[in-house]
């Protein structure tokens, strides 16, 4: 380190008056210390608690620390476990790597059948909790791409069997109409099945792989499990994805509550 006598005027000025960039870096370092990171986790945990409460009841005094409120909440491992009640929430595994651009995959090891069965209960839904460290993405690829691809694959895999079952059921309703869009011969992927931030090029790349994804799912899903899925989704209708963040929490939570009624 130079002494003041050895410093030039420019170096002394920088010591006394740091540049904007140096100030910005110093602030960033302070914001990313352990205390601030834990405060951020706590704030997001409180946000999840509030959303769970709003979805489950209109009573603002509801105690979220109960089995009923968390019966449909899944923490996506591992990151999501920081933000959901670890004692009450269930867990699922959707990997971001399966949704990375130019590397879209359907995992034969991570079918997450329990998520489907829970979402298909009467008035049911599933809230999958996850987070991303990206400063440019609102949702991690696990939520924004892997989950909707997974839902689209399962809808197409069971569509024909669901329609056949509903035709035999005298109590079938207009819910059947929703299934016809998943029975196209080319297993077309519709634009509204993925979030708006997925580009058209990426959507086209996923479409090309959908037929193989459906085959992959059917090749590993046991017959008894497949039958259970068909019966469950025949009652509830196809899987639909909604994305809730701080920016759109009110509108989408209101929509979820309306669907459950």
Predicted regions and their residues:
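Non-catalytic regulatory/accessory regions that flank a structured catalytic core
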Residues: 1-261
